[in-house]
């Protein structure tokens, strides 16, 4: 009988590193240009073909709601792109937050790939942005966030819409780190059934239930050819799929990634870990994100709300999960924490 590793032997997978975009969340958006260059050039030398570089919330992300980075997206992108020898710089664009004008600026600064991201039921907000990215000649992916909140048939319909707008790759995005391998397989498989053979499928995982690697392998089994991850797992919540660990698993299974495993390990240990303000791991609160199906970016916001209102962050996160709050509703974290504090007699009503 053919084993799992035998069935994937020789399969080619493209890595896309997120530590300079998703990792901004874990660093409270405080990564400097020189740090960006150091990380990106090391990833480039390790053979990583795509490196995402923006504010954590993507183009247009600098704001009161999402936090302010020390530099503009244009400064980050331009500085990194100028140093790349083989890797392409990518960006995140959420329609309604980022604009086509900002995408043009990112392209002018050297970005050549984009994740156009919508909630998993709102692909119809992305046609203009996807079409514009294709017009610029960018490698263009549709990115269905919080994919656990739509069933496989729904994900297939949304992915088909993104493909019709011009997306060359469609992502199943486990923003909450909630999914298990069978959930990933069902959604990726549903996409593979309806998308054209030439349209790629990607998977973006978070490690909140410790399933980032298993889910990424499940995605490949079901037909995905692009996998997002982050060296040392630097990302929101318990981090993204740790790329160097995933690379080692792929090598064991005979999956062709094209990256230098030992160099990736060195980037993680020598550059990323010393940058961390806190160890990005599965802790009480990040585990709650995965358990309750909450957007991973809410982690630090909820911890700050807990300090302010005296309600445990875990309780806040469970309530946000019950309400099915999604990315972009960060303002509701404070509102929820305040309401819970009032209900518990911790805060006097005005």
From Swiss-Prot:
Gene Ontology molecular function terms on file: 2-isopropylmalate synthase activity; 4-hydroxy-2-oxovalerate aldolase activity; manganese ion binding
Residues at which substrate binds: 21-22, 175, 204, 295
Positions with a binding annotation for Mn(2+): 22, 204, 206
InterPro entries: 2-IPM_HCS-like, 4OH_2_O-val_aldolase, Aldolase_TIM, DmpG_comm, DRE_TIM_HOA, PYR_CT
PROSITE patterns documented for this protein: PYR_CT (PS50991)
CDD domains recorded: DRE_TIM_HOA
Domain Pyruvate carboxyltransferase: 13-265
Keyword annotations from UniProtKB, A to Z: Aromatic hydrocarbons catabolism, Lyase, Manganese, Metal-binding
Pfam families given in the database record: DmpG_comm, HMGL-like
Top-rank taxon, per record: Bacteria
EC number: 4.1.3.39
NCBIfam families for this protein: 4OH_2_O_val_ald, PRK08195.1
PANTHER family from the UniProt entry: 2-ISOPROPYLMALATE SYNTHASE 1, CHLOROPLASTIC-RELATED, HOMOCITRATE SYNTHASE-RELATED
Family (UniProt): Belongs to the 4-hydroxy-2-oxovalerate aldolase family.
Identification of the protein by name: 4-hydroxy-2-oxovalerate aldolase 3
Organism: Azotobacter vinelandii (strain DJ / ATCC BAA-1303)
Gene: lapG
């Amino acid at each position: 009988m053919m084993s799992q590793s035998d069935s994937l032997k020789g399969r080619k997978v493209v890595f896309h590193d997120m530590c300079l975009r998703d990792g901004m969340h874990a660093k409270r958006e405080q990564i400097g240009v020189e740090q960006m260059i150091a990380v990106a050039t090391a990833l480039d030398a390790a053979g990583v073909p795509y490196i995402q570089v923006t504010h954590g919330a993507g183009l247009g992300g600098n704001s009161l709601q999402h936090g302010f980075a020390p530099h503009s997206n244009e400064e980050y992108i331009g500085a990194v792109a100028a140093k790349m020898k083989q890797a392409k710089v990518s960006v995140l664009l959420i329609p309604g937050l980022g604009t086509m004008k900002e995408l043009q600026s990112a392209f002018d600064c050297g970005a050549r790939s984009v994740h156009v991201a919508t909630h998993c039921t709102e692909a119809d907000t992305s046609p203009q942005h996807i079409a514009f990215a294709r017009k610029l000649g960018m490698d263009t992916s549709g990115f269905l966030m919080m994919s656990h909140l739509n069933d496989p048939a729904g994900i297939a319909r949304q992915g088909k819409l993104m493909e019709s707008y011009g997306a060359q790759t469609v992502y199943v995005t486990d923003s909450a780190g909630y999914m298990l391998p069978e959930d990933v397989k069902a959604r990726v498989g549903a996409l593979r059934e309806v998308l054209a053979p030439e349209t790629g499928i990607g998977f973006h995982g978070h490690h909140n239930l410790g399933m980032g690697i298993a889910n990424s392998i499940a995605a490949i089994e079901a037909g995905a050819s692009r996998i997002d991850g982050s060296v040392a797992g630097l990302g929101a919540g318990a981090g993204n799929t740790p790329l160097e660990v995933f690379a080692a698993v792929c090598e064991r299974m005979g999956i062709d990634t094209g990256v230098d495993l030992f160099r990736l390990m060195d980037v993680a240990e020598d550059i990323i870990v010393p940058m961390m303000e806190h160890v990005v791991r599965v802790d009480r609160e990040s585990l709650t994100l995965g358990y309750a199906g909450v957007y991973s970016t809410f982690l630090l916001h909820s911890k700050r709300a807990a300090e302010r209102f005296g309600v445990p962050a875990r309780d806040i996160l469970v309530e946000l999960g019950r309400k099915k709050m999604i990315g972009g509703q960060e303002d509701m974290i404070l509102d929820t924490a305040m309401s819970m504090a009032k209900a518990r007699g911790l805060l006097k009503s005005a």
